[in-house]
């Protein structure tokens, strides 16, 4: 059942995300055609401002979901209801905090923008973004019950359908009215509709959530708040690393640069969301496995899933380095391109982040938040300081470079240490050394494939979609050949190959 739910979670997420991805690129094409770069910059900037306000969440969601894995596995309805009551109470407090801080920031908005004079109704635009953040905390907490029961595909299916409708409506509004305010109103209300549907379904499917009104016992709350305390530092790091780039860029380079960068972020966001449905689909299953069977098989499962994540992120990182400018030129135009140096730095940061993902999934599923709490604080400080120093000389490349440097000095070595030392435990030093050897080889593989592919593509035309497909196929062949040569005989590759062949045979025979 664990494996089946993981696969359903993954398939539902992938199909919906593919449709959303196609529509989001279509919507962005319409956006840049009907509105200016400054509006695109505002869209990215305010998104990051609200991302910073999410610091008020303090990691409550992750801590609560981790606490639900065991009672869900044991079907302890009373304990689940108690945890959900606490979740609701905490998220109401968060919503009020976000609203208060968000309103207090309004007078300072003009100081964050350079070149935003041509954008009308800035305060109204900001209020719409703020309302979207506040309502998400008031309405979305019942999603957690599906995550605990490994049924996140139900929430994802609703979210993807409503998301597709939202994108279509936003495209229609831009084409017919060119009105950014109406565009944002749709962006505000459609997620509220998603939450309302999930809320109603959860009440029908889990009626015991209304039956019990009390909160968890004081000792249980203490354990949860301990995890929240650790996760708050992780949340701080995430906010500073992920939500300050556009703020610094806007202040030093202007909204137009933020607009250009937002197109690259759109591509990476869609790729990340796509891959997140694959890696994230296993989080609840890992937590469920740990709750029922302990950590005996955790390392073996980690090796396989971590290798699978490398194949996905490695393949896409190399492809993005060689082809992302070709794609952006075709979709948005020459004026929306960054130099190749900036592109390499952006994708290097994407690959570093990708190689961390499976380790983070295991950390979350195993509840190892406490052990690397100060790492998060160090990462945040280094990122902010280095980005502010480098942006003056190197611009966008300096901002992203700050993120890379902070990751290399903290996350890249300390996160696997925590996982092996406190999650795997047995013979952890040997396993940690093996992890770092694998990490270096993976970088060499992706860098080599990217360099060879880029050199070949410079000898080819970059004029139309057909050549884009041809170059994508050539890159795929090169990557596959190198992976087979380097990893073809490893246990992880053999396991994934055998599992894929077995699934295909079942499908061909009409099996499940």
Predicted regions and their residues:
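N-terminal membrane topogenesis motif
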Residues: 1-24, 78-85, 120-123, 150, ...
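Transmembrane helical elements of multi-pass membrane transporters/channels
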Residues: 8-28, 40, 162, 186-198, ...
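Membrane-interface junctions at transmembrane-helix termini in multi-pass inner-membrane proteins
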Residues: 3-7, 133-161, 181, 347-379
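Helix-loop junctions and terminal segments of transmembrane helices
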Residues: 29, 58-74, 147-148, 206-208, ...
């Amino acid at each position: 059942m664990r494996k089946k739910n993981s696969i359903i979670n993954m398939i539902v997420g992938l199909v919906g995300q593919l449709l959303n991805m196609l529509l989001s690129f279509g919507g962005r094409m319409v956006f840049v055609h009907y509105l200016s770069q400054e509006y695109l910059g505002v869209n990215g900037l305010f998104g990051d401002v609200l991302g910073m306000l999410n610091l008020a969440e303090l990691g409550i969601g992750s801590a609560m979901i981790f606490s639900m894995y065991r009672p869900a596995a044991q079907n302890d309805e009373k304990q689940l209801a108690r945890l959900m009551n606490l979740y609701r109470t905490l998220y109401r407090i968060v919503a009020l905090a976000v609203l208060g801080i968000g309103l207090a920031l309004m007078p300072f908005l003009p100081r964050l923008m350079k070149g935003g004079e041509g954008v009308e109704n800035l305060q109204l635009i900001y209020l719409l973004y703020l309302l979207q953040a506040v309502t998400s905390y008031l309405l979305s907490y019942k999603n957690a019950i599906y995550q605990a029961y490994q049924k996140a595909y139900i929430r994802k299916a609703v979210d993807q359908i409503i998301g597709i409708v939202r994108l279509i409506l936003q495209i229609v509004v831009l084409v017919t009215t060119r009105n950014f305010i109406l565009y944002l109103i749709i962006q505000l209300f459609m997620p509220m509709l998603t939450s309302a549907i999930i809320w109603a379904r959860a009440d029908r499917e889990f009626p015991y959530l209304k039956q019990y009104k009390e909160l968890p016992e004081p000792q249980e709350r203490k354990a949860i708040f301990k995890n929240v305390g650790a996760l708050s530092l992780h949340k701080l790091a995430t906010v500073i690393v992920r939500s300050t780039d556009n703020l610094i860029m806007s202040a030093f380079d202007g909204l137009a640069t933020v607009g250009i960068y937002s197109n690259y972020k759109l591509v990476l966001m869609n790729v990340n969301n796509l891959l997140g449905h694959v890696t994230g689909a296993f989080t609840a299953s890992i937590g469920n496995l740990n709750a029922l069977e302990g950590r005996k098989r955790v390392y073996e499962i980690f090796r396989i899933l971590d290798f699978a994540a490398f194949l996905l992120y490695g393949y896409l990182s190399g492809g993005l380095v060689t082809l992302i400018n070709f794609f952006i030129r075709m979709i948005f135009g020459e004026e929306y391109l960054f130099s190749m140096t900036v592109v390499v730095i952006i994708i290097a940061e994407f690959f570093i982040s990708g190689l961390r993902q499976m380790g983070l999934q295991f950390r979350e599923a195993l509840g190892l938040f406490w052990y690397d709490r100060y790492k998060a604080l160090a990462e945040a400080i280094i990122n902010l300081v280095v980005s502010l120093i480098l942006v003056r000389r190197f611009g966008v490349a300096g901002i992203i470079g700050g993120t890379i440097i902070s990751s290399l000095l903290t996350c890249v070595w300390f996160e696997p240490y925590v996982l092996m030392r406190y999650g795997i435990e047995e013979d952890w030093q040997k396993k940690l050394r093996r992890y770092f050897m694998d990490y270096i080889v993976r970088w060499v593989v992706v860098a080599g494939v990217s360099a060879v592919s880029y050199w070949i593509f410079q000898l080819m035309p970059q004029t139309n979609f057909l050549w884009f497909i041809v170059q994508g196929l050539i890159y795929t062949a090169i990557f596959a050949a190198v992976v087979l040569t380097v990893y073809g005989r490893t246990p992880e590759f053999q396991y994934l190959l055998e599992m894929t062949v077995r699934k295909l045979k079942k499908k061909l025979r009409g099996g499940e």
